[in-house]
Structure formats: C-alpha cells, structure tokens
Amino acid sequence: MTFSNLCNEIFWKSTTDYHVTDSVDAPMNNPYELKTIEYYLYLKNWIDAVQWHFEDIIRDPQIDPVEALALKRRIDKSNQDRTDLVELIDSYFLDKYKEVKPLSDATINTESPAWAIDRLSILALKIYHMQQEVERTDTTEEHRAQCQIGRAHV
C-alpha cells in the first residue's frame, strides 16, 4: 500500500467515525497505537473534521456574540493544534529519510510532505460532504446534480 493510500484509508475512517456523532464535542476514539504515524494521521483528520464544523457553527448569523467569541478561541486553539501536528508529521518524514541525500539538481516542488498530507485530509472531508449533499432528499435535483459533478471533480 502506498503512503497516500494509507492516508486516504485512515482519513476516510476518521471522517466517517466523526460523523457518527457529528459533534464538535464528541471524544475521539483513535483506534491506532499511540505515537504511530497512523495515530497521527487519524488525529490530523479528526482535528480537520472538528474545525470544518466549527466553521459551520461560526457562520450562523444568529450566533450569540459571547458564544462566537468562545468558539473563535476554540478555532484558534484548533488551528495551533493542527499546525503542531503537521510539524510532528514532517518530523516523521525527516527522520524516516534522514539518510537520503538529495541530488545536486533537486528542486522543491510542493510544500512540506505534511502540508501535502493536510490537503489530502481536507480533500477527504470535501468528498464526504459533497456525497452527503448528493444523497440529500430535501434539495432540488439541480442541486444534487451540481454536487455530483463537484464530487466527481474533487
């Protein structure tokens, strides 16, 4: 299994596990061994799922300003946790490939590996939510078709 396939498998599991309760306050039950890359990938996606739903909550035009401020602080902490975890995942790669010597003409073609993995995690959430929109029965056929097209392009 490639590393990206491992990521996708774990991200999908975390995404579907989160949506069992669909609550930003639900405790995470990470099935992977503590301090393994699998554990960190699951945690990464869980943080992203919670953050996704924090953003939904804060966009509510009827949100109480006091609740909004408290939520903003939770979002800030979540962002810091996310960044710290990305750095930890990058450390995993630095250690794993510490003996590899780059070629003299090597170029950097992306962000760090962990930020690329971050994009895969967000992509898993986008795919999940687009599929939810496709399956809704309380929307128009046009909306569902548009979401189906969007999901196919994600």
Residues of each region from the PLM?
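Conserved small/polar residues in nucleotide/adenosyl-binding loops
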Residues: A152-V154
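Short, charge/polar-rich alpha-helical segments
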Residues: N30-L43, D76, S104-L120
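Leu/Val/Ala/Ile-rich N-terminal alpha-helices, chiefly Sec-type signal peptides and the beginnings
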Residues: M1-Q62
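Non-transmembrane amphipathic alpha-helical segments
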Residues: K44-R59, S78, L85, I89, ...
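Soluble, cytosolic/nucleoplasmic coiled-coil alpha-helices used as oligomeric scaffolds and tethers
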Residues: D64, L88, D95, E99-P102, ...
